[in-house]
Amino acid sequence: MSGRGKGGKAKGKSKTRSSRAGLQFPVGRIHRLLRKGNYAERVGAGAPVYLAAVMEYLAAEVLELAGNAARDNKKTRIIPRHLQLAIRNDEELNKLLSGVTIAQGGVLPNIQAVLLPKKTTKAK
């Protein structure tokens, strides 16, 4: 038991940690950035996988809502305005990104109720 293997299996094609976790976001790159970023002295193996999964979920959520906003405006390309509308119309995303300014995003259309014309009832 000297630690040397007896022949063993030949190394197959390497699989990325992203593909092992079933993610699109790069787990290896996120791990490297966590180590280089002076966030902690050591970074566990599961931390970058979890962070990549969370980031991928948030990106997918924002993109889906922005795609819906683009489709509502009869457009096929998502622009910053669609991102703004998607985020500000979603309660949870708006709370998460309340301190974020989106360049070229504009504002939500909003008219105060007191400024709207009064509804008159017709007497019969």
Swiss-Prot record:
Q: What Pfam families does this protein map onto?
A: Histone (PF00125), Histone_H2A_C (PF16211)
List all disulphide bridges recorded for this chain: none
Report the superkingdom from the record: Eukaryota
Region annotated Disordered, chain positions: 1-23
What is the recorded post-translational modification? Phosphorylation of Ser-2 directly represses transcription.
> Which Gene3D superfamilies does the UniProt entry name for this protein?
Histone, subunit A (1.10.20.10)
Signal peptide segment = none
Q: What is its main location?
A: nucleus
Q: Which positions bear Phosphoserine? A: 2
Biased composition, class Basic residues, residue ranges: 1-18
Q: Which UniProt keywords apply?
A: Acetylation, Chromosome, DNA-binding, Methylation, Nucleosome core, Nucleus, Phosphoprotein
N5-methylglutamine: residues bearing it: 104
Q: Name one GO molecular function term.
A: structural constituent of chromatin
Residues with the N-acetylserine modification = 2
Q: Where in the cell is it found?
A: Nucleus; Chromosome
GO CC term, one of those recorded: nucleus
- Cross-referenced PANTHER family: HISTONE H2A (PTHR23430)
Q: What does the annotation say about its assembly with partners?
A: The nucleosome is a histone octamer containing two molecules each of H2A, H2B, H3 and H4 assembled in one H3-H4 heterotetramer and two H2A-H2B heterodimers. The octamer wraps approximately 147 bp of DNA.
Summarizing the function annotation, the protein's role is:
Core component of nucleosome. Nucleosomes wrap and compact DNA into chromatin, limiting DNA accessibility to the cellular machineries which require DNA as a template. Histones thereby play a central role in transcription regulation, DNA repair, DNA replication and chromosomal stability. DNA accessibility is regulated via a complex set of post-translational modifications of histones, also called histone code, and nucleosome remodeling.
Q: What does the similarity note say? A: Belongs to the histone H2A family.
Name listed for the protein in its UniProt record: Histone H2A
Annotated organism of origin: Platynereis dumerilii
